[in-house]
């Protein structure tokens, strides 16, 4: 479903933990990382689409999260032609998104990346609030900036972005392995079937994006 200008209605999700860190997912069998997002189906409200996408991409249910805020208006980004599948070129321009800020009230082990037969992510991690601006693919960066900035006013303690000239920063908490502090972050893992106190690690971030179809 596209609007008259060729933008697909979509929702984006910024999921916070208790430390104001954000959920960051690695796309299935790819090296690109992003926030959960997905299209709004015909007849759905943005909130209904958000809860559906949240479950499809993270396995979380409404009782696992609390809505903190949402963007006032649609935020748009255009997708470069080289990333658009041939069959939709000339019709599809990009996404227009309503962004939701959620607070996770469940546990890390409630996250299940295999909640559906068509998972979007194969690994995940918690990142500091502003880190995605330095890591997301360039054509989404302006929308991420707008969404993160607008929604930061809802945080318990406003997240201040620092070191703007520097690249992606490590998570605020060190990753642990076998109960001991690790000297390096371990490879990203899927904690879908595990409930423990060990936080997921992360791979090096890669900005190589997938080609976009209308289901993204």
From Swiss-Prot:
A motif (Nudix box) lies at residues 38-59. Belongs to the Nudix hydrolase family. RppH subfamily. Keywords: Hydrolase. The keyword Hydrolase applies. It comes from the Bacteria. It comes from Burkholderia mallei (strain ATCC 23344). Residues 6-149 form the Nudix hydrolase domain. The lineage of its organism: Bacteria, Pseudomonadati, Pseudomonadota, Betaproteobacteria, Burkholderiales. Signal peptide: none annotated. Its cofactor is a divalent metal cation. Its EC number is 3.6.1.-. Accelerates the degradation of transcripts by removing pyrophosphate from the 5'-end of triphosphorylated RNA, leading to a more labile monophosphorylated state that can stimulate subsequent ribonuclease cleavage. Residues 159-188 are annotated as: Disordered. This is RNA pyrophosphohydrolase. GO terms for molecular function: pyrophosphatase activity. CDD domains: NUDIX_Ap4A_hydrolase_plant_like. InterPro entries: Nudix_hydrolase, NUDIX_hydrolase-like_dom_sf, NUDIX_hydrolase_CS, NUDIX_hydrolase_dom, RppH.
């Amino acid at each position: 479903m596209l609007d008259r200008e060729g933008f697909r209605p979509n929702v984006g999700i910024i999921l916070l933990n208790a430390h104001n860190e954000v959920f960051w997912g690695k796309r299935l069998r790819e090296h690109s990382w992003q926030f959960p997002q997905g299209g709004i189906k015909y007849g759905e409200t943005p909130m209904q689409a958000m809860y559906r996408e949240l479950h499809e991409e993270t396995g979380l249910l409404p009782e696992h999260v609390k809505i903190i805020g949402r963007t006032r208006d649609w935020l748009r980004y255009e997708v470069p032609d080289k990333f658009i599948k041939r069959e939709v070129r000339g019709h599809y321009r990009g996404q227009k998104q309503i962004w939701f800020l959620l607070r996770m009230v469940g546990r890390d082990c409630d996250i299940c990346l295999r909640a559906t037969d068509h998972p979007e992510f194969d690994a995940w991690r918690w990142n500091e609030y502003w880190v995605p601006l330095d890591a997301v693919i360039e054509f989404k960066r302006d929308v991420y900036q707008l969404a993160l900035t607008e929604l930061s006013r809802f945080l318990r303690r406003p997240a201040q972005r620092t070191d703007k000239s520097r690249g992606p920063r490590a998570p605020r908490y060190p990753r642990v392995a076998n109960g001991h502090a690790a000297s390096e972050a371990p490879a990203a893992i899927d904690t879908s079937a595990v409930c423990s106190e060990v936080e997921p690690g992360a791979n090096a971030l890669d900005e190589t994006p997938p080609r976009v179809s209308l289901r993204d």
